[in-house]
Amino acid sequence: MPRTLNRRALLAAAASLPVLAGVAGCSGGSTAAGGTQQLVWSTFGVGTGTYNDLAAVANTLTQKTGRQIRLMTSDTGIGRLAPLINGTAQYSRTGDEYYYAFEGNDEYCSEQWGPQALRLVWTPPGNYGVLVRKDSGIETVADLKGRKFPKLIASTSINRKMEAILNYGGLTGKDVQMVDVTYSGQIEALKTGQIDTLYQNVVGANVSELASQYPIRWLDLGGGTPAQYATWKELAPMVKPGEFSKGAGLAKGETAVNMQYTIPVVARADRPHEEVASLVADMDRYYPDYKDTTPDAHRFGADQIQLTPLVIPFHDAMVEFLERKGRWSKDLQTRQDALLERERRMHEAWPAFWQDHKDQEDPKSARKEWVDWKKANLPELPETPGTLPGASSTTAPSGGHA
């Protein structure tokens, strides 16, 4: 059974979020085939690539199936997930918060949260990495030693990915000059010399504009030894190396390897099977109608669904869909079953754990002890081929973050 949050806290969080009825109007009451006609999906803010992709899908499904879908936006992970957990939203396209909420880690290790029973519904891939100006003299990650490196404000998950990138080059945070900057402020900071590198989606208006003004280079993260990827599993378990082309600053035919991961559509585990089955079937059926509407929407194709690293379970209706498409495997089922067992044991242990730790003055202490408890008491998850170490996966670029 999925855990429920403190109702007052969740309703307050949900009430503070804008619901954009203009994306797809609500005319209400009846149900479309396979589930609810009126749906709310939470996601990133208006103007982000993530929002634009989801709006394209929502509008297409409204026009083709009669589903009335509204998008609810938030700039924070908790703001995107709280409406999903309390039932205000039925689906959410999230950042890495889906993983941390499933595990009950970081800010989700709290009275209001704890581990959540979330499921993957659709997982389009995306590519992200660090870039530099070509006139910087920086050609590899190792060349970042002594340079000004961004420490993103209020972006713990991305900072962990950037630490993993440094580790790939044999560096740590002590080998660079850390500069506090917001995610959106990185491009201007690079232009003015406040930082020497930045972390970014490989496509998007902002990075394309930067590349048109200053020739840029994506630092390659491919072809490494297992040792170079040794910390990726702990720091960024949802990430693997992925080759991309057609990214900002790349010449025709040029490719590079950076981090590949999904900004997925997720639902609660108890979302009705028939509804999810109908939804994913329609996302596949009407893919030709929305695939060219944004620069990234083509990555929503069923043949491009990202399957690894698998860090939370797929919804059972999506597993059936992937089986029909010939994309499911014995290794994936083994991993899926292990994640379901991990979820069961976390949910079983959480109430007693929190009772013993809720009064600690420093919330970070409880967070660390929860991670330590899991390491000591839960079996290691089985690996799936094609994840780490060293094996790259090829994809065209996709969107994700703002």
Identify what each model region corresponds to.
Residues 34-168, 179, 218:
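Short, glycine-/small- and polar/acidic-enriched structural segments
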Residues 96-98, 104-109, 136, 174-275:
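Pocket-lining segment of extracytoplasmic ligand-binding domains
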Residues 1-17, 21:
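N-terminal secretory signal peptides and thylakoid transit peptides that target proteins
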Residues 148-164, 238-306, 310:
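Ligand-binding clefts/hinges and TM-proximal coupling segments of bilobed small-molecule sensing domains
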Residues 23-25:
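C-terminal motif of bacterial Sec signal peptides marking the signal peptidase cleavage site
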Residues 27-29:
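Bacterial signal peptide processing site
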Residues 56-66, 159-175, 194, 210-214, ...:
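Ligand-binding cleft/hinge of the Venus flytrap
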Residues 202, 206-218, 274, 284-402:
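An extracytoplasmic/periplasmic, membrane-proximal ligand-sensing/linker region
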